[in-house]
Amino acid sequence: MNFDDRDGVIWFDGKMVPWREARTHVMTHTLHYGLGVFEGVRAYHTAERGTCIFRLQEHTNRLFGSAHILRMDMPFDKDTINEAHRAVVRENGLKEAYLRPLAYLGSEAMGLRAEGLKTHVVVAAWEWPSYMDPEARERGIKVR
């Protein structure tokens, strides 16, 4: 199944949007100049606590740190972005998942200077089973 043709929702600029309707324009500044930030986040199902997002706060801190380096003004605070992660997992009914938070610049202007551009933020999540054998997850693994 293509990534643009899926059921579910994506958190897009503060709202849950149907997956197929989460769109951006081809003249978006980030598409042309590569000025955007993202993280790759995993969620795992646990017997004790259900689905847990691995090191969510650390990922969010890094996303905001990267945006700061690129002088992107994040339109949401860290707590809102953390809740967006939890919401897309919950709303999509995911147990084992990959999450992709992404901040990118809009299409208000074009050129090398990224001034006066709106920062958009999305959080998408999709089913992604663990690479680890379920038995190994229960008993643990040895790392040398």
Whereabouts are the PLM-identified features?
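Conserved alpha/beta cores of soluble small-molecule-handling proteins
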Residues: M1-R144
